[in-house]
UniProtKB/Swiss-Prot annotation:
The species this protein was found in: Clostridium perfringens (strain 13 / Type A)
GO biological process entries: translation
Region annotation (Disordered) ranges: 93-121
Record key words, sorted: Ribonucleoprotein, Ribosomal protein, RNA-binding, rRNA-binding, tRNA-binding
InterPro entries: Rbsml_uS13_C, Ribosomal_uS13, Ribosomal_uS13-like_H2TH, Ribosomal_uS13_bac-type, Ribosomal_uS13_CS
Protein name as it appears in the record: Small ribosomal subunit protein uS13
Gene of this entry: rpsM
Amino acid sequence: MARIAGIDLPREKRVEIGLTYIYGIGLPTSQKILEVTGVNPDTRVKDLTEEEVNSIRNYIKDLTVEGDLRREVALNIKRLVEIGSYRGIRHRKGLPLRGQKTKTNARTRKGPKKTIANKKK
């Protein structure tokens, strides 16, 4: 099993798809990595030679992925909250940041509905 950036890549998948299991690498980045390293995207992860795995590892070493990327994103959000920007306030309140309406919907960001009991008349 190929282990790259601390992640065990699934053996049966194509390398192109297997690399996307690493946080911070999507399909376009995966394709670029394989193009630069000269690895065939249709190769299965289990069929990679040690030389190919090392060339992929060396390329990914220069990218910000996994823990470093997660930390960077968390610090960016923390900075927004600390400076009190609009986006930081929305993060703090757990609301959508990018101008979506919140009268209805926005349930993913707001969480389950908090129902209010009707008053007796």
